[in-house]
Amino acid sequence: KLYGVPFGTAMAGGILYNRKIYQDLGLSVPKTWADFMANNAKVKASGKVAVAQTYRDTWTSQLFVLADYYNLHAAVPNFAADYTANKAKYAETPAAMKGFERLKDVHDAGLMNEDFGAASYDDGLRMVSTGEAAHYPMLSFAVSALKQNYPENLADVGFFAQPSDDAATNGLTVWMPPGLYIPATSQHAEEAKKFVDFAGSAPGASTESSAD
């Protein structure tokens, strides 16, 4: 049976970076956390902000943890199922604590903007797109806001996966899109089916993506 139709786009968690800064400083996209921190040290030495953080919008503070899930799953494949079943805990799983430790690493190395507690999500996008900052841990949906608010700088922004300690383990944390569903008790099932059919079609997907 068909229970639902995907609606929207998949989303990834990783790190936005300024391509111009990377080019000017001769940096390469890091494949390990050590490489990332070495890049940050060079950025800081150049006088730029290495990692933008924007805790005025508190949800942005979790990105180092969220984006590290690919690495957590690679190290402990059963963690999500065990965590859901209350058989595993973050504090007792070293691989799960890595994301929190990454945030501490960046803070303790003095790599953040001084106003990280007051800066907003849009401040972070501005900083990484205009070259005030080299990196901004973020979700890929930020492309829409960058396109809207900083279109002239959009091409200067790249995106890479949050590195692990092993270059052989390197990938994006991905969220699949939500779905549209029709209740069996709906009094307008036929109308709803027509809408869902359109939403799941190529024209419907194109319309939704272009408006996002």
Regions found by a protein language model. Give the residues of each.
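A local structural motif
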Residues: 24-29, 104-118, 132, 149-157
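Periplasmic solute-binding protein
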Residues: 1-31, 37, 57-84, 174-182
